[in-house]
């Protein structure tokens, strides 16, 4: 297992998803360009899935299929899974998180499982509030922190704080919202634009 890089876009949307539903478990998928052997796995985007129907397999299948098709159109693969437990002091992956991450790893062996650390999930955390796990055989184990890269951690951290202050998380749409009202955009293009506009002036371009 090589390096993994987490983009601002992927990190920010994951945090906003957890912030929108602070008393619920939430989960989602990471997308990445398929890396060649030995290349860094770059998680460029994430798709928030559920906040109330996490264990319903039919809805999960629908979501996985739609995200897979949508990602493929942009040359991306489902390369990881994130999960935040409802309990503030629980950062351990439960049976559901392990099952979904395992399913993704069947198709993409280098997939990562990221658990959000709710105790560190504050507007501007000093260190990334995540635990990155990799698949080793039948077990998910913490990935070497030296192999976890951030496109720009300082910028990502500040961006989450600013967007929370602007209440941007209230505009985030997960698959639950979309299934309740199919007019709602689970790809979050409006929010993506808001994030990339923030990144652009800092980096000189619109890439997250």
Curated annotation (Swiss-Prot):
UniProt GO BP: protein insertion into ER membrane by stop-transfer membrane-anchor sequence; tail-anchored membrane protein insertion into ER membrane
GO CC, one annotated term: cytoplasm
UniProt entry tagged with the keyword Membrane: yes
InterPro entries with a match to the protein in the record: EMC8/9 (IPR005366), MPN (IPR037518)
Keyword Endoplasmic reticulum: yes
Localisation: Endoplasmic reticulum membrane
MPN domain location: 4-139
Main location: endoplasmic reticulum
Disulfide pattern: none
Membrane topology: Peripheral membrane protein
Keywords attached to this entry: Endoplasmic reticulum, Membrane
Database matches in PANTHER family: ER MEMBRANE PROTEIN COMPLEX, ER MEMBRANE PROTEIN COMPLEX SUBUNIT 9
Quaternary structure and interacting proteins, as annotated: Component of the ER membrane protein complex (EMC). EMC8 and EMC9 are mutually exclusive subunits of the EMC complex.
UniProt family annotation: Belongs to the EMC8/EMC9 family.
Function recorded in the entry: Part of the endoplasmic reticulum membrane protein complex (EMC) that enables the energy-independent insertion into endoplasmic reticulum membranes of newly synthesized membrane proteins. Preferentially accommodates proteins with transmembrane domains that are weakly hydrophobic or contain destabilizing features such as charged and aromatic residues. Involved in the cotranslational insertion of multi-pass membrane proteins in which stop-transfer membrane-anchor sequences become ER membrane spanning helices.
Protein name according to UniProt: ER membrane protein complex subunit 9
Gene for this chain: EMC9
